Amino acid sequence: MQLNAHEISDLIKKQIEGFDFDAEVRTEGSVVSVSDGIVRIHGLADVQFGEMLEFPNNTFGMALNLEQNSVGAVILGDYLHISEGDVVKCTNRLVEVPVGEAMLGRVVNPLGKAIDGKDDIDVQGARPLEIMAPGVINRKSVDQPIQTGIKAIDAMVPVGRGQRELIIGDRQTGKTAVAIDTIINQKDSGIRCVYVAIGQKDSSVAAVVRKLEEYGALENTIIVTAGAASAPALQYIAPYAGCTMAEYFRDRGEDALIVYDDLTKQAWAYREVSLLLKRPPGREAYPGDVFYLHSRLLERASRVNAEYVEKMTNGEVKGKTGSLTALPIIETQGGDVSAFVPTNVISITDGQIFLETDLFNAGIRPAINAGLSVSRVGGSAQTNIIKKLGGGIRLDLAQYRELAAFAQFSSDLDSETKAQIDRGQRVTELMKQNQYSPLSIAEMATSLFAVNSGLLDDIEVNKVVDFEAALIAYMNANQILLMSKINDTGDYNDKISNELQAAIDDFKQNHTW
């Protein structure tokens, strides 16, 4: 078959007319150097701070240093396959993490990818890693309690919804145990929980997952983990990722709780990243913005008003307030709370629960130091009955610790001092609580009423714990209506006081422990 010149020109015209080409404009650069998870890139003129960068083999990084002739970025994951000369592309979007109900019950890395061996997560959307904290006008005062189920905390240092309460202490003093017990106690409260594990052993995180599953709290919890073997950049962004996931629930008019375990390791990771990026070091070799590292994270925990929720949901949710409560954990060295990072976080938060090694070793667990622990806003959110019955507990314990130290040097004590020491010993025993056994409001109120009314004065100190366990079992079995009323209303009046008195008197007369 022969084609003449006219047919050939027609074919060429058709080909030209049918040619479809969409011009794609993007900024590209090339890798100049790569080491220790830090990449120097040349040519990304339009990159913005915190932007997600695309590397070969579906690897992503984050731009942190914007210099005149180069860009310093951290790799979010494995970087061993990246080499000099590789092409780097801008994505024109900040680092994002997936959010939504589907994340509950799952273990994910800081980028939101499942690492629990189950199916992929069907995410409902994504949000930027870093979001501005709600403004002053959008906030509401903290006036609702979050029950930890731990007597010593709910009575002495209560936590409110939307509060930031620091848990601080040396290693192996029960900091994680307090946080996990609090999460377990939320399984029927409707409060969504996020547990962020930073720089921990994978075996430790697996143990936490097993415990939450055992007590039925995992289905209500998201676990974000950046283990000890993870890149420092992932440990640095892990708290922000967890916070973004928790804010999804707050902004929909729900209540959420987030635990950062722990921010000391995040500060170490950020220090490592900053030094590798050749940022000038300051005190203890931390960069100059280490305070801002934690303040911009913890300020995102808040209680927001209904107008804010309505705006964030585009009018879908009306008339509901939301809250995000933060329990950051800080590890101290040798009980030194005046070190750089601990003082920073203490100044940012709304109070602290100080756990002491000496108390822990003495068998007083949770090892809460009543004198150094404080809650700056939780008192206004405390349940009425716990507030009235537990008001003097903190003072009793603090005075007892002082008197006990003084009594070691003197054998001749007046009757009033002896009475205070005897009461303090019983209160100390009463504040002991086993791990994974949170108490309801009514159970807590029963214990506090017993010690406040002097009903423990004739109980031997070493029998107080057994007496309390038997009393609570008796109340749950024989005083169901009274316990339900206290749990439902949280009120305290003369009628409830008389009923509690009669019930405990009956127990002491007719039961053994």
Curated annotation (Swiss-Prot):
Species the sequence originates in: Ruthia magnifica subsp. Calyptogena magnifica
Keyword Cell division: no
Family: Belongs to the ATPase alpha/beta chains family.
GO CC entries: plasma membrane; proton-transporting ATP synthase complex
Keywords on record: ATP synthesis, ATP-binding, Cell inner membrane, Cell membrane, CF(1), Hydrogen ion transport, Ion transport, Membrane, Nucleotide-binding, Translocase, Transport
Principal location: membrane
Pfam families listed in its UniProt record: ATP-synt_ab (PF00006), ATP-synt_ab_C (PF00306), ATP-synt_ab_N (PF02874)
SUPFAM superfamilies named among the record's database cross-references: C-terminal domain of alpha and beta subunits of F1 ATP synthase, N-terminal domain of alpha and beta subunits of F1 ATP synthase, P-loop containing nucleoside triphosphate hydrolases
E.C. no: 7.1.2.2
Task of the protein: Produces ATP from ADP in the presence of a proton gradient across the membrane. The alpha chain is a regulatory subunit.
Gene name linked to the record: atpA
Transcription regulation found in the keyword field: no
Reaction(s) catalysed by this chain's protein: ATP + H2O + 4 H(+)(in) = ADP + phosphate + 5 H(+)(out)
Gene Ontology MF term list: ADP binding; ATP binding; proton-transporting ATP synthase activity, rotational mechanism
Subunit structure: F-type ATPases have 2 components, CF(1) - the catalytic core - and CF(0) - the membrane proton channel. CF(1) has five subunits: alpha(3), beta(3), gamma(1), delta(1), epsilon(1). CF(0) has three main subunits: a(1), b(2) and c(9-12). The alpha and beta chains form an alternating ring which encloses part of the gamma chain. CF(1) is attached to CF(0) by a central stalk formed by the gamma and epsilon chains, while a peripheral stalk is formed by the delta and b chains.
Membrane topology: Peripheral membrane protein
Protein name as it appears in the record: ATP synthase subunit alpha
Site (Required for activity): 373
PROSITE patterns: ATPASE_ALPHA_BETA
Annotated binding of ATP, by residue: 169-176
Enzyme class: translocase
Cellular compartment(s): Cell inner membrane
UniProt-listed InterPro entries: ATP_synth_asu-like_sf (IPR023366), ATP_synth_asu_C (IPR000793), ATP_synth_asu_C_sf (IPR038376), ATP_synth_F1_a_nt-bd_dom (IPR033732), ATP_synth_F1_asu (IPR005294), ATPase_a/bsu_AS (IPR020003), ATPase_F1/V1/A1_a/bsu_N (IPR004100), ATPase_F1/V1/A1_a/bsu_N_sf (IPR036121)
